[in-house]
């Protein structure tokens, strides 16, 4: 679980407006932060299949949000990908 201070910082960095917490950009950024925090856990605990299911669910949700954003506004999609460093 990410700390509330880190979560607030991620929201502030990716918000489109002052109180924006629900835009696809913010949701993708929060999921990315959670995924990046969980990744080292699975390097150490390779047999944690129950936790891995949750991780894969987060990755799938992020993928769907990115697909939605790409369909709605490709410029915002490319800016977000570059900002978060998701695509190689």
UniProtKB/Swiss-Prot annotation:
Any one biological process term the GO annotation gives: translation
Q: Which GO terms describe its cellular component?
A: cytosolic small ribosomal subunit
Q: Which is one Pfam family of this protein?
A: Ribosomal_S15
> What CDD domains does the annotation carry?
Ribosomal_S15p_S13e (cd00353)
Q: Check the record and name the InterPro entries matching this protein.
A: Ribosomal_uS15, Ribosomal_uS15_bac-type, uS15_NS1_RNA-bd_sf
The protein's GO terms of the molecular function aspect are: rRNA binding; structural constituent of ribosome
Q: Does the keyword Lipid metabolism apply?
A: no
> Keywords in UniProt for this one?
Ribonucleoprotein, Ribosomal protein, RNA-binding, rRNA-binding
**HAMAP family per UniProt:** Ribosomal_uS15_B (MF_01343_B)
Q: What does this protein do?
A: One of the primary rRNA binding proteins, it binds directly to 16S rRNA where it helps nucleate assembly of the platform of the 30S subunit by binding and bridging several RNA helices of the 16S rRNA.
Quaternary structure and partners: Part of the 30S ribosomal subunit. Forms a bridge to the 50S subunit in the 70S ribosome, contacting the 23S rRNA.
Q: Report the family membership.
A: Belongs to the universal ribosomal protein uS15 family.
Which protein is depicted? Small ribosomal subunit protein uS15
Taxonomy, top ranks, is: Bacteria, Pseudomonadati, Pseudomonadota, Betaproteobacteria, Burkholderiales
Name of the gene encoding the protein in the UniProt record:
rpsO
């Amino acid at each position: 679980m990410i700390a509330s201070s880190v979560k607030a910082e991620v929201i502030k960095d990716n918000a489109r407006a002052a109180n924006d917490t629900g835009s696809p950009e913010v949701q993708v950024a929060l999921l990315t932060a959670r995924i990046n925090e969980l990744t080292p856990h699975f390097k150490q605990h390779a047999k944690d299949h129950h936790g891995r299911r949750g991780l894969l669910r987060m990755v799938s949700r992020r993928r769907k949000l990115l697909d939605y954003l790409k369909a709605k506004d490709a410029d915002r999609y490319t800016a977000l990908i570059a900002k978060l460093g998701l695509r190689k």
